[in-house]
């Protein structure tokens, strides 16, 4: 028995295939899903979705969104997603360093919009870098 996984962003379908197991980056921590999982909806955080198929793991970088598990079908709706194998790790690492610098420049800003944006940029850069290194 397998799962059907669909990962959708507003501008593209990133993944639409079967999987043996998936690990979702939910807002409450990592969530493993196997065939026969109970029906549920969960919020998705910035992070890496891991997909096991035929003994091989693939990674998908995600920004926030939602996931629904229903009858061995998992649908993930996010603002942005990209397959780890399509991410240039050098570019992802450069973006991560840039985001760290941007956040450090705003560290004394309290909860200013600039600091919140810098933290969001850092979270996205971390997810893309991790996904680029996972494949």
UniProtKB/Swiss-Prot annotation:
Signal peptide: none annotated. It comes from the Bacteria. Residues 101-112 have a biased composition (Polar residues). Pfam families: ATP-synt_DE (PF00401), ATP-synt_DE_N (PF02823). Gene3D superfamilies: F0F1 ATP synthase delta/epsilon subunit, N-terminal, Helix hairpin bin. Disulfide bonds: none annotated. It is found in: Cellular thylakoid membrane. Keywords: ATP synthesis, CF(1), Hydrogen ion transport, Ion transport, Membrane, Thylakoid, Transport. GO terms for molecular function: ATP binding; proton-transporting ATP synthase activity, rotational mechanism. One of its GO terms (cellular component) is proton-transporting ATP synthase complex. It is a peripheral membrane protein. CDD domains: F1-ATPase_delta. Residues 89-100 have a biased composition (Basic and acidic residues). The keyword Transport applies. The keyword Membrane applies. Its main location: membrane. Residues 89-114 are annotated as: Disordered. HAMAP family: ATP_synth_epsil_bac. PANTHER family: ATP SYNTHASE DELTA/EPSILON CHAIN, ATP SYNTHASE EPSILON CHAIN, CHLOROPLASTIC. Produces ATP from ADP in the presence of a proton gradient across the membrane. Belongs to the ATPase epsilon chain family. F-type ATPases have 2 components, CF(1) - the catalytic core - and CF(0) - the membrane proton channel. CF(1) has five subunits: alpha(3), beta(3), gamma(1), delta(1), epsilon(1). CF(0) has three main subunits: a, b and c. This is ATP synthase epsilon chain. The lineage of its organism: Bacteria, Bacillati, Cyanobacteriota, Cyanophyceae, Synechococcales.
